[in-house]
Amino acid sequence: MIAGALLPLWSFAWFMSLAVLIDAYAFTFGGVPGTGLSFAYGMLIPAYFSMWVAGRLSKFYLTGEPAGFAVFFGFAMLGTAFCELISSGSFYLWSGNFEPTLSEFLSREFEYAPATFSSSAYWAVAFIVGSVVSHAYQKARALQGLSH
């Protein structure tokens, strides 16, 4: 989300490649069980891309104004919702580890999604606080430059 707001589009491919390399190492040498490796693994690309797109769409609102930060936070939560639905939904449907019923999926979402949303909210708020501090510092420097 934050990277989508700050970095060029080509860096998404770089980050996805890095994630695949880290996962390959973890599955091959790190002792991580391959239960997450299924057709659903490929769905991480659109899942993460939904977060990236949310960041790209929100970047125009990052003007330093409170309303813009609220829009940024809204995009962060919307991107998180799409990412969660794509990643968890595809893993649930295609991993072969679960009985694919709506009630089972929803019970798992109610168990695990709050942690996903709270993590995204934490990082979005941390970014907003950092942006507020940065904007305040830039304004102070500009005013200081005008007074000399």
Question: What is each PLM-predicted segment?
Answer:
Residues S17-L57:
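Interfacial aromatic-anchored transmembrane helix boundaries in multi-pass membrane proteins
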Residues G4-L7, M51-K59, F127-H135:
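Hydrophobic transmembrane alpha-helices
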Residues M1, M43-M51, W123, F127:
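Hydrophobic core segments of transmembrane alpha-helices in multi-pass, intramembrane catalytic enzymes
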Residues Y61-H148:
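Membrane-embedded alpha-helical hairpins and interfacial helices in multi-pass inner-membrane proteins
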Residues L6, V20-L21, F82:
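Hydrophobic membrane-targeting signal helices
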Residues M1-F15:
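Generic transmembrane alpha-helix motif of multi-pass integral membrane proteins
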